């Protein structure tokens, strides 16, 4: 019995010592945890900007040798840039877009390089969500349109023996026969529109701006008459002594009216997209003219990682622009239409969402 009592006592003593050591270790661990620095929790900053840059370069070439059906050897090249920078925070947004488009064409039948496409388009829109609405925004919209370089219509020179002349002489005759059609800021269109934006989803928006200031700029005197620029005040009412070289017209025409703009972009899938923009402007100060219409369409079909097929169309109707027929006669308002198809290299840079 004595041995059993001694064994039990020894076990109790050892258990007590073990419990004391465990309590001491737990206390030390708790102190260590309290003294340890707290781990930093990284809070991701809100992202308000989304940027993208799309570039496209197309090259075309045709070579004919002893081709019975005839034709021209041609070389063409065009470049397109579409940059977007959009900001959104809460009920406010600010969207910015810049499109640059330029191309040229050389054909063996003409010893000159011709411009095939030329466009500058800048748009900036600010909007603030209207109270107690879901899709309506108060908005201010600014845009600017023009082109980089002078554009000509190249008519065949009426000179005998043109084909037998040396290249420089041919070039000089072609330049003498060309007709100036446009240039940088000739024309240029810019306006500021205040109104309401209807944005039901990410791919569609409709803007109505009943307060729109519009400026048409033609800095080349010889083109002002074709764009119906207003007569300068010093020549108003004069029957004689009025210049006829275009200097009698002002370089700026101001309009005040209403604008309706519709934008839509539909991505059918990751490789196929369609975008369109329609803009109508009616001038309160000149109601005898029809509303100015601009309608642009673009189809992008991505064939491979860096290659795409593109179709673009541009339609313009402006009855203040006088366009002559093929013979250079009967100038009047006409529907302007341009269509192009291109296959080329495409590269897109976009910010991560």
Locations of the language-model features?
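Sec-dependent signal peptide cleavage junction
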Residues: 17-54, 353
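Residues on the lipid-exposed face of transmembrane beta-strands in outer-membrane beta-barrel proteins
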Residues: 53, 57-59, 79-87, 122-128, ...
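Transmembrane beta-strands of outer-membrane beta-barrel pores
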Residues: 57-63, 89-91, 100-106, 142-152, ...
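Surface-exposed strand-loop-strand hairpins of Gram-negative outer-membrane beta-barrel proteins
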Residues: 60-80, 108-112
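Residues that define the transmembrane beta-barrel architecture of outer-membrane proteins
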Residues: 73-79, 116-122, 186-190, 252-258, ...
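Repeated loop/turn-to-beta-strand initiation elements of outer-membrane beta-barrel proteins
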Residues: 92-94, 133-136, 203-206, 271-274, ...
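Outer-membrane pore/translocation modules
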Residues: 115-255
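Outer-membrane beta-barrel "beta-signal"
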Residues: 336-353
